[in-house]
Swiss-Prot record:
HAMAP family: HscA (MF_00679)
GO MF annotations in UniProt: ATP binding; ATP hydrolysis activity; ATP-dependent protein folding chaperone; unfolded protein binding
Highest taxon above the source species: Bacteria
Name the record gives this protein: Chaperone protein HscA homolog
Presence of the UniProt keyword Chaperone in the record: yes
Classification via InterPro entries: ATPase_NBD (IPR043129), Heat_shock_70_CS (IPR018181), HscA_NBD (IPR042039), HSP70_C_sf (IPR029048), HSP70_peptide-bd_sf (IPR029047), Hsp_70_fam (IPR013126), ISC_FeS_clus_asmbl_HscA (IPR010236)
Family named by the database record: Belongs to the heat shock protein 70 family.
Keyword flag Nucleotide-binding: yes
Function: Chaperone involved in the maturation of iron-sulfur cluster-containing proteins. Has a low intrinsic ATPase activity which is markedly stimulated by HscB.
S-S bridge residues: none
Gene: hscA
Amino acid sequence: MALLQIAEPGQSPQPHQRRLAVGIDLGTTNSLVATLRSGLAESLKDTEGETILPSAVRYLPDGRVEVGRAAKAAAAVDPLNTVLSVKRLMGRGIADVKLLGEQLPYRFAEGESHMPFIETVQGPKSPVEVSAEILRVLRRRAEEALGGELVGAVITVPAYFDEAQRQATKDAARLAGLDVLRLLNEPTAAAVAYGLDRGAEGVVAIYDLGGGTFDISILRLTRGVFEVLATGGDSALGGDDFDHAIANWIVEQAGLSADLDPGVQRHLLQLACAAKEALSDSGSVALAYGPWQGELSRERFEALIEPLVARSLKACRRALRDAGIEPQEIAAVVMVGGSTRVPRVRRAAAELFDRQPLTDIDPDQVVAIGAALQADTLAGNGRDGEELLLLDVNPLSLGLETMGRLMEKVIPRNTTLPVARAQEFTTYKDGQTAMLIHVLQGERELVKDCRSLARFELRGIPPMVAGAAKIRVTFQVDADGLLNVSARELGSGIEASVQVKPSYGLTDGEIARMLKDSFEYAGGDKAARALREQQVEAQRLLEAVQAALEADGEALLSPAERAAIEAQMQALRGVLDGPDAAVIETHVRHLTQVTDAFAARRLDASVKAALSGRRLNEIEE
């Protein structure tokens, strides 16, 4: 919905002038910028007539920065100063990046908060700075083509990008001088590009295989409303991996050493990429590297990439299961990303969903076009009846740590965004005046199996008995998937909050691993959670009974009664660290039974003390 525009006194609001906004597909391999002109979405071309900008940045000794084709062409001769596929590094930590070492021929330095910096002749550069160079070129291209300054841009991101990766994308845009109208999930943008919002109803699958990431989204379309039923994918699967599969095959066939210098790696990857593209139209391609010559057939290529294609299909099946949808219920399959030009990929999607996928729009441009349509609406240019409602979801559950190091989910995964959820918690010990809020992301039951996002403290809680204080913790996730968490003690009104901005993102495949583990270990996790909960309950009971004995044991219990209680306490302590929740529960019940009479006497004594010295009419009043 457009904001109301109020003109300055004496000035015309000029309603006929369109506000200039663009959609940007910031891709792993290539990037594009698109806009709406005369009611039609189009990708904007550079001065050489090219729409695609290779996502390549080269830093030169004289201080200049090359972006695009020139940088990509120099990758083999200047690999250490030429950054490709920087999207893989966005929002990641230095430890995550080292896991990709063999695929990334750069020299890395560790910055603040474990941020990875790429060493170049112009000094260390962060992934955010590199991405900003790409966005800066796209912004200039758009402003030159449109003849004015942009009011903002919709930038697309993989549906599986977590908070750190999304925030890194926003930071890069800010460095490039762009106002981000919204971050839009790439699969959702593709659905917009195909016009599926106009009158179409049903369930659609968006199969998005780009250069470095794979996303599958299951969307329900109802009267122009997009609802994402489920998302899935792999944050480290794409066309780059196809290139590496071919390059490794060449190394093996040519008898090359596995320890190759960066320049050779770059050259082999360029050779592999050209072969991959040729095999989309030809049955075989001739290859040569140094003295070695060979031929790669399409059949052999498909065998090399079959494990990668299978990974994408596995994610598709998981997303269908999450959405509660059978493959035959899918009304349309939209193919997105340059890697979907590979015939084996198209066949695999057709076989899984039992229908031919939609490939009418250039798969390299479809995401940028969808983003441009959404940007035009958000900029206030939408015509009556053409507003678009996009409901995205969070890819993993969000929650916090409770006693016993348990994960309490506050916002389950696949919850429609934006969303705000609140849950009330209480103190564990008498007189507790502070609470540590530990924010987590993941699907498992125990804290150790989930990812830590942030920690903050709520201080100044009025001292009271355990369980009396009420602390409301509110999770808010905006339309871009960014999280804010606040905690408020309801009695005193004290409050603390944190914007979750972790310094790096998930490791390769970590989201997929989290989901996989949540299914595989569901039974064991529930048993472990039950054990922890029983241990927490037992510990709480032991502390309460011990405090009661110290306060009133001598006055209200006979020596035999006290001995019986202490014996049962000792028995409970003996099984407290054991593996059987049922055994602990039995001992808790026994201790409760043996202390029932003691609890009743303490209550009577408290009532007598409260009424002592008061007249009947005072009590009645």
